[in-house]
Amino acid sequence: MPIVKDTLRATVRVGYDGRVTKQFRGPKAEERFDNEVKVLRHLNARGCPFVPRLLDADAEQLKMVTTNCGSRVEHLDDARLRELFAELEIYGVRHEDVEMRNVTYRQQDGRFCLIDFEFATILPEGK
């Protein structure tokens, strides 16, 4: 399984079946894992169409498996970037890391998607 990202905080691999495996490590790895899993479950339950679907989560290994949301985006207009992250709040989540590195492009449906929710916040209902 090829490594797509290898940092102090996580290793991300994309399998030949298209599934993405993220192994958390480093500072506050357990807390970041728990938060990302919680946020993805929240977004998946609300039918958010532009985030990965959580397929599996192993708390002992701090490893999760998701669907693949496409390839990284190199350039995006600042206004469109802000709009994309603002759209996430309709589903009750603030990303908290509004950066290009957290945007992908899914060619199958021509959709920009968001990834990496380890620092995201679930907003109170009605916000």
Regions found by a protein language model. Give the residues of each.
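ATP-binding glycine-rich loop module of kinase domains
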Residues: 1-42
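Conserved hydrophobic "DFG−1" position in protein kinase catalytic cores
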Residues: 14-15, 23, 56, 65-68, ...
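Short beta-strand-loop-alpha-helix junction that forms the active-site gateway
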Residues: 25-27, 70, 119
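Conserved structural core of kinase catalytic domains
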Residues: 29-32, 41-84
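Acidic active-site catalytic centers that drive phospho-/nucleotidyl reactions
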Residues: 36, 97, 116
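Catalytic-loop of the protein kinase fold
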Residues: 90-106
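Activation of the activation-loop gatekeeper triad in protein kinase-fold domains
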Residues: 115-121
